[in-house]
Amino acid sequence: DVYKRQGMLRSLKAMDAALGALRDVLPPGAFTVKCRLGYETPDEFERILPVIASHSPDRVCIHARTVREGYRSPVHPEWVKWAAGMLKCPVVANGNIVDAATAEAWVRLARPAGLMIGRAALRNPWIFSQLHSRFQGHPAADLTFRNVLHYIRRLYERTREMQEHYVEEKHIHRMKKYLVYTARGLPDTFDHYMKRAKTARDFMRICEDILD
């Protein structure tokens, strides 16, 4: 059976079998488990964590929300802290880490071994350097529109290189999807004109006119 959208959280028997099979074939150090707290309510994690622990994972990453809670509800750091005290392996926290303040709150409230950043990195690709500066006790450098322009240029070229068959119009459409996240906080004119670009030349001209 294939379990979609964290559906395995509803069947501890299926989870137990899958984790056991993975543990049997993965070499030491390679077995990481990532999960949410449960499907409906956070207290389901009390039953889920012992199943995970029984297979001696090398690390566990916890998105501290349930499936039903999606991505918009508050996170539950107390469950990550509980897991860190129960497991013998490193526990990594995930969920709503969008800037230095939320990262510091996670460290203070849950004391995880590490942090996993997902969607926030699409909106703010500089978050990693910002967190590094904050945890080193240094102020983060202020971002400029030129930083964003440099990022767009690199993203365009890198994603183009990854395509086996480059089609300009399709690539521009793909870039628009990426920049839906990054465009937040930029002038409204950027989003307005960027979405109307049809060619690579027009796309880059719009970016340069507004951001340079």
Give residue spans per PLM region.
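Residue-level preference for long, well-ordered alpha-helices that form the structural scaffold
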Residues: 11, 41, 72, 141-144, ...
